[in-house]
Amino acid sequence: FLQPYTDVNWLDPGCAAEVMCQPDNSFTTEYTNNNSDFQALRNAAAARHLDVNIVPATERQKKRLIADMDSTIITSESLDDLAEMAGIGDKVAAITQRSMSGEIDFESALLERVAMLRGQSNRLVSNLIAATELTPGAIVLVQTMRANGAKCYLISGGFDFMTRPVAALCGFHDHHANHMHVNDGKIL
């Protein structure tokens, strides 16, 4: 039903590929949501932890990548990791979970979590940066987007002490996040 007319073009061998197709129908969202063949393809892909997306050829090359940092470009939640290093991980993770489930708003959760870190040594920050792991494929994603002319931005509801080195390592054009104040080697 998709009628591929190209071989697989591997963007990242074994991880990401594109196949150019000439669909036999207009692939609107409504059509794909109601098409049993497409749903079977999506289900088979999901069973193998793969995503399938249909994008018009005229819109396939993107001009911008805006990526969240925590649990997207890096493998974990940086503020939770910082709290873990400070010995208050469970308390901060519980607030994070309440925020993610909509029980409390983001700003309140952020202020509450940062207040719990007040007075901690800023050495925790350098330890956190050293321990942070990139999600496999993050660098390839940014390099591929840049090679194709896209502007790439890293964003976070966390802090710029993390987005700065992660953005530099991956090759993002710029980064945007909150700023954590430090004075006399202590988190304020």
Model-derived features: positions:
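Non-catalytic pre-domain segments flanking phosphatase-related domains
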Residues: 1-67
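Glycine-rich tight-turn/loop motif centered on a GG-T
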Residues: 188
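Alpha-helical substrate-recognition element adjacent to the catalytic core
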Residues: 4, 10-20, 57-60, 70-185
